[in-house]
UniProtKB/Swiss-Prot annotation:
This is UbiA prenyltransferase domain-containing protein 1. It comes from Homo sapiens. One of its GO terms (molecular function) is prenyltransferase activity. The keyword Coiled coil does not apply. The lineage of its organism: Eukaryota, Metazoa, Chordata, Craniata, Vertebrata. Keywords: Acetylation, Corneal dystrophy, Cytoplasm, Disease variant, Endoplasmic reticulum, Golgi apparatus, Membrane, Menaquinone biosynthesis, Mitochondrion, Nucleus, Prenyltransferase, Transferase, Transmembrane, Transmembrane helix, Ubiquinone biosynthesis.
Length: 338
């Protein structure tokens, strides 16, 4: 996007002459109104697609899958690696597609700008049609994985479809269609989709039935995942307000956003402390990440929001992994089925 060039004019580098839009160059080709994107290698193109997926956020979908699978293993003694991999790919595909939908609609609504964290379309790293095609591919990949899971898993079709397409709908409607993000309901969608729903999906795929207790065990992880989104929305509070959209961070203001972030950050540790005291000491493993949480609290308090969502996602990943290890290491019968 060469802002210094005059729109409708182009320099002929062969002759040094100025060529008007619509004229032909010495080779007989039409001169487009805007410069074309420079040709890039396939490696650069692949790197651009990976960047558009925001892979740093994938802890929000991988840790719930790991937790649901660990609960299935600890409660029923079953863990099919094929189902684990298929479930992880399906959830990752839906998550990645949801990120692309968010990128597309934020750009089309004029929310993303040069100072935004996601400048995939603003900087023309990819074109809008590239993002749309990639999103369709990922949703299709997710559906193919769901179909494979149906043939491999003992879970009933109606239960699998209900959970999977519920998550798929949530990932799209976050910014597409209704656009829950723009009416302060995005936090609720993320809290449900990348918390209880993803954990239940991974658990049910393994054991072939639904249960209540995986939803309860998903709460600490869901709160940590919501902290990622809330830190992102707090950082973008001013630009979102200028764009005319409403998020939870805008509604409650900076002070209560700080209080909410701390609640989302530290409440899981209270839950882990209670579980470690009354159930098994292995569930104290996530407490090892408390120093990271205090570091994030200081960064939020000082309003140094740069890279805060990414650092919160890193905490979410480590906390989730320690939580999963704690579940796996728990003695048989020590975990209550609520």
């Amino acid at each position: 996007m060469a802002a210094s060039q005059v729109l409708g004019e182009k320099i002929n580098i062969l002759s040094g002459e100025t060529v008007k839009a619509g004229d032909r160059d010495p080779l007989g080709n039409d001169c487009p109104e805007q410069d074309r994107l420079p040709q890039r290698s396939w490696r650069q193109k692949c790197a651009s697609y990976v960047l558009a997926l925001r892979p740093w956020s994938f802890s929000a979908s991988l840790t719930p899958v790991a937790l649901g699978s660990a609960l299935a293993y600890r409660s029923h003694g079953v863990l099919d690696p094929r189902l684990l991999v298929g479930c992880a790919v399906a959830v990752l595909a839906v998550h990645g597609a949801g990120n692309l939908v968010n990128t597309y609609y934020d750009f089309s609504k004029g929310i993303d700008h040069k100072k935004s964290d996601d400048r995939t379309l603003v900087d023309r790293i990819l074109e809008p049609q590239d993002v749309v095609r990639f999103g369709v591919f990922l949703y299709t990949l997710g559906c193919v994985c769901a179909a494979c899971l149906y043939y491999l898993s003992p879970l009933k079709l109606e239960h699998l479809a209900l959970i999977y397409f519920g998550g798929l709908s949530g990932s799209f409607l976050y910014t597409g269609g209704i656009g829950f993000k723009y009416v302060a309901l995005g936090d609720l969608i993320i809290l449900i989709t990348f918390g209880p729903l993803a954990v239940m999906f991974a658990y049910a795929i393994q054991v072939g039935s639904l249960a209540i207790f995986p939803l309860v065990y998903a709460i600490p992880l869901a709160l940590s995942t919501e902290a990622i989104l809330h830190s992102n929305n707090t950082r973008d509070m001013e630009s979102d307000r200028e764009a005319g959209i409403v998020t939870l961070a805008i509604l409650i203001g900076p002070t209560f956003s700080y209080i909410l972030y701390n609640t989302l950050l530290f409440l899981p540790y209270l839950v882990f402390s209670i579980l470690a005291t009354h159930c098994t000491i292995s569930l104290a493993l996530p407490l090892l990440t408390i120093p990271m949480a205090f570091s994030l609290e200081r960064q939020f308090r000082s309003q140094a929001f740069n890279k805060l969502p990414q650092r919160t996602a890193k905490l979410n990943l480590l906390l989730g992994l320690f939580y999963v290890f704690g579940i796996i290491l728990a003695p048989a019968g020590s975990l209550p089925k609520i």
